Amino acid sequence: MQALLVGGMLGPVGLRAASAPSGHTLVLGTQPLGMPCSAISALIQRDQVLQQTLARTQWRLSHRPFGKGSDMLPLLSLRQLSAAFLGDMPTLVAAALGEAAIVGLVKQTSTAIVGRGLERIEDLRDKRVGYVEASSAHYTLLQALNLAGLQESQITLVPLAVDQMVEALERNDIDAFAAWEPASSLALMRHRAHRVIFRGSTTDYLVINHFFTQEHPEISLALIASFVRAIQWMRLSRLNLDKAVRWANDEATSFSGRALALPLRQLTAIVERDLLDVPAAPWVSPPDAQSPLRQEFEFLARLGKLPSQARWGQVERAFGYDGLSKVLTQSRQYQTHVFNYRE
């Protein structure tokens, strides 16, 4: 069933029949347990405009779900993933190695350190802290420790999947955790003793393999057009947003065996706050020398959290990719206002 179709008839968007051999697959890495990127990826997977565009040149879309962005980096490097939704720390790693073209903003918000019975960052000393290695929340934890004059060696790091953290805190298996939404909101809802002791700003991005954009430029633009459509469609009405969040919840259930525990209204509020209400999103300005992302790069490099061959110039090049600009300035050609989502 078609969810919605506006803006005209489906037609060609510039793909040429010779642009790819038969049977090629555009493989998208997704994170079903994170909002709002899971809502976007759920829409991209159901986007019939994208499916028809790809089919004209014998391409198809496939998705691979992951619990954390750092698990996607080796596959993105090996080109087993064409594109991925990544937090800022994995994005920096991929970009600094020259392997990424950064398309646009997926999330602008904060990640949180949530503790049970803790008041300050300094209270983390000698405590067990749940975290996801090389994630945006890991960077937030490193920031917090640095501000408190603590080292990672002065806490006990407990690697956990993001959907395990709230229950681990409730069972007293850990004393605190660093995570992204919806984990932090869920923890606050579940127990009055849970409180946020630190927040750090964070961003997520849609990233395409750099070499993929060079070898298959129009396929890359077709994916970007679907990305833009997803955000436009959610902005059109609350009904659309609710549907996208329900589909995202279905993806989370399929991936982890259980639905996201927050009520629908809170999940939609996260998508609105972290993406739809962000001015100009998904557009993102290239970072300059004073940007938070440059500061993050320098901070992680000092701590030895980036590969030795990582270079800031590669990050600047990654942000220089003009795919989003092309799609937005040629919106009619790329059908960014044509919506057709499979139920």
Role assignments for model-derived ranges:
Residues 20-151, 156-159, 175-178, 196-200, ...:
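Short, glycine-/small- and polar/acidic-enriched structural segments
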Residues 131-139, 163, 214-221, 287-291:
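Soluble non-cytosolic domains of exported or imported proteins
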Residues 158, 163-259:
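Pocket-lining segment of extracytoplasmic ligand-binding domains
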Residues 1-18:
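N-terminal export signals
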